[in-house]
Amino acid sequence: MSVTIGTPLQSSAFKVLLLGSGELGKEVVISLQRLGVEVHAADRYDHAPAMQVAHYSYTLNMADPVELKKLIESIQPDLIVPEIEAIATEVLIEVENNKLATVIPSAKAVNLTMNREGIRRLAAEELGLPTSAYRFADSLESFRAACDDIGYPNFVKPVMSSSGKGQSRVKSFEEVDAAWDYAQTGGRVKQGKVIVESQIDFDFEITLLTVRAKNPETGAIETQYCDPIGHRQDAGDYVESWQPQAMTDAALTEAKRIAHKVTVALGGCGIFGVELFIKGDHVWFSEVSPRPHDTGLVTLASQFQSEFELHARAILGLPVNTTRHSVAASAVIYAGVDADNLSFSQLNQALAHPETDLRLFGKPEGFKRRRMGVATARAETTDQARELATQAAEHVQVIVASNQ
């Protein structure tokens, strides 16, 4: 089966609509551009990172069914690639059912993973995968009961949030009401529902990037895996990641089994970020994102094809290569201030080591804990790579430029 791509901005163009235009989407756009795809990028605010490298950009409320449907009808894309959760998924289901475009990886996957309830019930209740104990709550009263039922300490997350927003660790009943209030302000959609999870005694967390792509000879969808990525979080937000993460053969086999089972259930082609807890040979499912994962930014330095190139190739029906060529790490660069018109200095010091690199995302506005860039580094060991990446990130100074 031949894969054909036309010419951007002409009638033969193969068009992709990206819903959500953050830093991960920016790298996806660049990968698609290199393969001759015409890219349309949408987000809720102007000048988002991926918009800056797309052929066309649009600002709208993607959670509004009317606005989203109007945009899709005007573009008539071949593929729709969601990058965030806050999308009117009922429109994507309608688009897929009417065969107006292909939703990546599938409308079902996007709908299930848009909130933690859908994917947790699929993983634990339908697929029988090992997870933490959990309860859902949609009121303060039911939340108090859920916390008591699960026990302390527990973890609380809005069912619709990302990058640690609204998440907290509740150590006792005295902290329950404050955790509820924090969860209500941190979710992407203020629907109130939260998940309360038991604390798992684990050694480390990994992201297992799992790629579903077509075999170039048979056309059958096959599953491939990148080497496991270790990561460190602060308040639920990724701070640094490294590849590979050492683990036992038994744990890696079980991690792949879990990732295979959940991604097959979600269907479609593309990359999935499967988050797992590891203790010895034991593995628990945590979450899955049907798109590139923030911890996977390390693959820009470690693999022949980064997670973004893998995603672009897989959704276009092209062969993929998940091989890692280097030990590498990534470290986040935060804004550290609430301001716009930012500048970044000491970049020459940050890049002084030949095995370091930077990605500055180009976000138009900074907040103290907003990711504005990432440093990557290669080395002989993960500890050395982590140290190099962290040093590079710390060299970067964020300056509030004059608005004159």
Curated annotation (Swiss-Prot):
GO terms for molecular function: ATP binding; magnesium ion binding; phosphoribosylglycinamide formyltransferase 2 activity; phosphoribosylglycinamide formyltransferase activity. One of its GO terms (biological process) is 'de novo' IMP biosynthetic process. Residues 121-316 form the ATP-grasp domain. Keywords: ATP-binding, Ligase, Magnesium, Metal-binding, Nucleotide-binding, Purine biosynthesis. N(1)-(5-phospho-beta-D-ribosyl)glycinamide binds at residues 23-24, 83, 294, 363, 370-371. Transmembrane segments: none annotated. Its EC number is 6.3.1.21. GO terms for cellular component: cytosol. Mg(2+) binds at residues 275, 287. Pathway: Purine metabolism; IMP biosynthesis via de novo pathway; N(2)-formyl-N(1)-(5-phospho-D-ribosyl)glycinamide from N(1)-(5-phospho-D-ribosyl)glycinamide (formate route): step 1/1. It comes from the Bacteria. It is an enzyme of class 6 (ligase). It catalyses: N(1)-(5-phospho-beta-D-ribosyl)glycinamide + formate + ATP = N(2)-formyl-N(1)-(5-phospho-beta-D-ribosyl)glycinamide + ADP + phosphate + H(+). ATP binds at residues 116, 157, 162-167, 197-200, 205. Involved in the de novo purine biosynthesis. Catalyzes the transfer of formate to 5-phospho-ribosyl-glycinamide (GAR), producing 5-phospho-ribosyl-N-formylglycinamide (FGAR). Formate is provided by PurU via hydrolysis of 10-formyl-tetrahydrofolate. Belongs to the PurK/PurT family. Homodimer. NCBIfam families: PRK09288.1, purT. This is Formate-dependent phosphoribosylglycinamide formyltransferase.
